[in-house]
Every structure is written in structure tokens, then in C-alpha cells.
């Protein structure tokens, strides 16, 4: 859809999420807006003067966090942000995922993360250990042991507080669309910022009844997904002014 309109798309992955592990001790986390900023700078250096951010899940949180942290100082070439299935409150979302009904999701996340930790332990044996990894049962335990110390946070609670986009939504100064499905199993009530959206002239919150977590399928006759079409419609409206 974007290419059909003459737009270029730049897709990027978090560190260690492309199928290849990065070489430094640091890898990815929800508050790493400096990585997003580098990608934006790269695109701008290539000559792009109108950049629209699109993200989902952790990437959605990162995009809103970037826009909120920048506030009025956001680069003029960053025009809008459109995000889906965003855990705006990381503490609340982590607790939701730790619930018994989400056990299968939690197991899958920790299984995937174990592979990354084992590689880090081989590359940085003095800083990272995979010993007793099987005892980790939720994100609080994982973030306390790995994410926080590796990336300079005091603990999981400190990481969640400083990396959640919800507290800075009020500071966003570019058009922003947040779409969180009512039936998203990963999102606690705190992840639906109704009051923040109501008080902001920049942030729009849409809460469809269905869609789950990044599951906005509804395939059209042209084989496009609803989520893709929503992005195109939103960005088109911004461009037209």
C-alpha cells in the first residue's frame, strides 16, 4: 500500500531481533530511543524530509516514548507516529503477562530470550550468566537479572518506569495514533490511556473490540491487512493536512 502511493519504507529490527545477535553486551529494551533516533538520522541523511514512524508492541512503545521525550524539540522531518498493540505501562503489562491465563505466551517469550542470553553468556562470561535460567518464570525476574543491570537500570521496576511511554504521552507534539484492541491479552487496563488522549490535541486513541495483539487481519480483496490500511489512511491524512 505504501509503495503504491510512492512512499518508501524502512524496516528495522531491535538489536538481536533480526536473526543475528549483535556483538556488544547491550542488546534491546523498550526504552532504547537512542537506537530509533539513529535510524531516523540515517534516513534523513539519505535525503528523506518527511518521516512517519510506525511501530507495534514494544516498537510502538519505543516510537511514542521517542516522540514524548523529544516533545517540542522533535526534528521537523519527523511528521507523525502510528502505533498498534502498545504496552504503554510496562509494569502493568508485565504483570498481565505473568497471569496464569497467559502462561503459554510467557513461556514462549522466555524460551526465545534464553537463546539470546546463552549467546551473550558465551560472549561476555564476566557480565552474563545463563546458569539457573530455568528458574526465571516471568518478566520481572528476567528484567531484574538481565535487562536492568545490562542497560543501567536499578531493577525491573526502575526499567519499566523509565521506559514506559505513558508518562510522556502528554508531551507529544506531532500527530500520533495509538490503536489498542480491547481483547489484547497482553494489555492491562493501564495500557489504554483514555485520559491522556482526551487531554491531548496530538494523540488519538482507537480501541477496536477485536484485533488481539497485533492481529488486525481483516484481509481485503487486494490482500492488504486492516492494520496496513489504517497506517496508510492516517499518514495520507497527515500529508494532505
Protein language model annotation of sequence segments:
Residues 145-168:
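Active-site nucleophile elbow and catalytic-triad environment of alpha/beta-hydrolase enzymes
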Residues 209-241:
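Catalytic active-site module of serine/aspartate enzymes centered on a nucleophile-bearing elbow/loop
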Residues 172, 178-180, 184:
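Short beta-strand/loop motif that positions the catalytic acidic residue
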Residues 8, 13-18, 87, 211:
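Short beta-to-alpha linker loops that shape the active-site pocket of alpha/beta-hydrolase fold enzymes
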